[in-house]
């Protein structure tokens, strides 16, 4: 990664500088007992540092959603899969929400993918879709959001930040379950 290539948008001279800064910013927010959902491209720049990066992060519970640069982690027999609590292409989770900051309690569903989708499972039930890949160039629609680090000054998002964004966003019924929609 250099100033000469297309991915110099993050203003680092080397991939090493970039990765060191990401690790520093993640560790400043994500604590040992937190749960981190990483939405892909863990091994951008090559597979040589997969284990090294994982060891430098304080968080013990990291779930990886495969991105287009994670081909060294994808194979079922990859030794790198052991670095993560789980690895998959998409993940749907229901999280217990008990947040004084957001004023919400109960459960909230999330559809996690490296790629942004127009529709996703249970969107008509209020499930929030979180994605990366597009480096902030693909605006969310309805209850979807690009949570890639490019959209948050190279920091991960807290759950409360995401919930706050969708506090007043109505549930989207535009899919095959609503026959009255054009």
Where are these regions (language model features)?
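Acidic, histidine-bearing metal-coordination/catalytic regions of metal-dependent phosphoesterases
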Residues: 1-17, 32, 154-182
């Amino acid at each position: 990664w250099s100033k000469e290539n297309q991915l110099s948008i993050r203003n680092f001279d080397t991939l090493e500088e970039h990765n060191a800064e990401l690790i520093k910013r993640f560790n400043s927010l994500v604590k040992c007992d937190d749960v981190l959902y990483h939405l892909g491209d863990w091994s951008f720049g090559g597979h040589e540092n997969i284990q090294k990066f994982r060891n430098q992060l304080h968080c013990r519970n990291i779930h990886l959603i495969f991105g287009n640069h994670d081909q060294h982690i994808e194979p079922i027999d990859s030794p790198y899969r052991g670095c993560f609590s789980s690895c998959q292409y998409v993940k749907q989770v229901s999280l217990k929400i008990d947040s004084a900051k957001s004023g919400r309690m109960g459960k909230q569903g999330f559809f996690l993918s490296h790629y942004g989708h127009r529709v996703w499972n249970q969107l008509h039930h209020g499930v929030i879709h979180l994605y990366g890949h597009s480096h902030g160039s693909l605006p969310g629609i309805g209850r979807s959001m690009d949570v890639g680090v490019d959209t948050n000054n190279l920091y991960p998002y807290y759950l409360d930040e995401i919930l706050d964004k969708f506090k007043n966003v109505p549930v989207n019924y535009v899919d095959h379950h609503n026959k009255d929609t054009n």
